[in-house]
């Protein structure tokens, strides 16, 4: 699709077909790996087990539904709260900025997939989870803050490369929206930890809180600020949910707050911002060079400020 190999007009259906094909290939590959490691198996219905499985899975399904609601309400409310034509246009502006956030969030999501079985096993065996939590926090804080700062300072060049129209409007929304990566990354750590601990009731409460906050702020800001209002609502919601889950995890699992890590985070952000600004200013016409050099310098800076300990190497 990206290679522009077709001579006919581009169709949105091509994206649907390619994504469906990608899912199918992934599913078949996963099935092949399972069969190779487990051998042949026969499918059959065990209704008592099926009933127990549904009962135990229901809280997880509710949690996923609630999280999906406060993550996706913004674009829907933009179309519904604004006049016809304006709503669709502003939803498009919001979506153009959201696509990059949706892409970079995948790294944090992969962390949560790895952390869930790890946390579950350690909690079951009554092992000390603090080192793993701290390491995950340091890595994802480094990743999220670095990506946010570098993308914000190079936003105009990136959006000019990705889009032909409405670049200025998207760039105004993007810095607010991409900052959501930081609280989302924290949610993927501490929400996963609470899930492994079995605190689904608390997680569902924080997700309900997120829905109410998101709807309330959207109702207030969208009529005045349009797409920027929706971005502010999203950032506010993610931040409130993240802090709620961090507080609940620290309280439930008695995780100590280490001042050294907090100071490292502050020093890293304080030094990263001027470095990223200087790099983007000097290589303003070579965005990929700016991102590469900024990434290398941020990696060195993370060890210099001890945000990432040398033991990680």
Residue ranges, per PLM feature:
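Hydrophobic alpha-helical transmembrane segments
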Residues: 1-36, 208-214, 227-248, 293, ...
